[in-house]
């Protein structure tokens, strides 16, 4: 009984953190006013094998209601028609420029090197990195620049709306935001000057140019597979201000459209954690299992198999209802499928399986694959 009360108490603390995050996260939107003086912004798009996404992304970026910006796209040695598509689009859009990436040098991970090349060619006093699988509202740039300038940030990143077009995405992607918003005290991290991990997300990273180069640009994170999180840490180390916002009203993305991409994408995250501390990954999943998954099993077992006292059932039922309410709130705020809470246990089971897969690859020393490139554990440690 005491154990179940402790689990419920932990769940309520997670719920409180979730509520504080949703309450205090800033939300750029159509209602944001224009800046009196609009700084010139370079929108930088690294693209590798993005023929299915790049045209939609550029169509949304070229129609921004912001007066001063350029769009640079770097084809990172794609094996598909990404470069051909961008070349066709730029003929009618002089603000769009296509760059061709250099071969990946020794000691660099792929995306950091692509971003570094883009930044070297950027002319803006602000630099915005966006992924090629993102789509943006016409007022995106106006609204995020208003927040970034007013808040005097060194790096602004955030949580876009995640579209789900298949069952694997419905199982995992809504669960991702549930975990992030429950675990990370974003409301606190946005205001502390301590050098703690940040919730920087590589799909959208906005810098003043001088702050980007102050830390050395992407060269500071050149060995990182999940370079976004580490870039936030570097900004904090340099005394800069990091801010994470809710981007769901100005940007959406459709990540990991196949099961294979989803496994690869999550595997690189877990691989990076394992390379730093296998014990940390084990601890995270132990907590996730006990707090977010086990209550469902306990309830079924207590009702149908091992008959438990009524007060025990009430406590475990409260655990399950708390999880469901938290899931529904997150799905509502980020416009996710509201029935996805029914798939909640499958989301945790999927991530545990991928974590075990990453652990096995790390133990065997075979590295982890991402977009046709193989990375070894040395790409996670400076």
Predicted regions and their residues:
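Acidic donor-binding/catalytic loop of UDP-sugar-dependent glycosyltransferases
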Residues: 81, 132-147
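Catalytic donor/gating beta->alpha subdomain of glycosyltransferases that bind UDP-sugars
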Residues: 148, 152-180, 210-213, 218-280, ...
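N-terminal membrane-anchoring/stem segments of glycan-assembly enzymes
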Residues: 1-37, 174, 186, 351
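Long helical/loop segments within the catalytic core of UDP-sugar-dependent glycosyltransferases
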Residues: 12, 18, 97-120, 143, ...
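Short, well-formed alpha-helical segments that are part of the catalytic scaffolds
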Residues: 24-31, 50-63
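Acidic donor-binding segment of Leloir-type glycosyltransferases
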Residues: 58-105
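Cell-envelope/extracellular polymer assembly enzymes that use nucleotide-activated donors
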Residues: 39-42, 70
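Membrane-embedded multi-pass helical conduit in multi-pass membrane proteins
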Residues: 35, 281-365
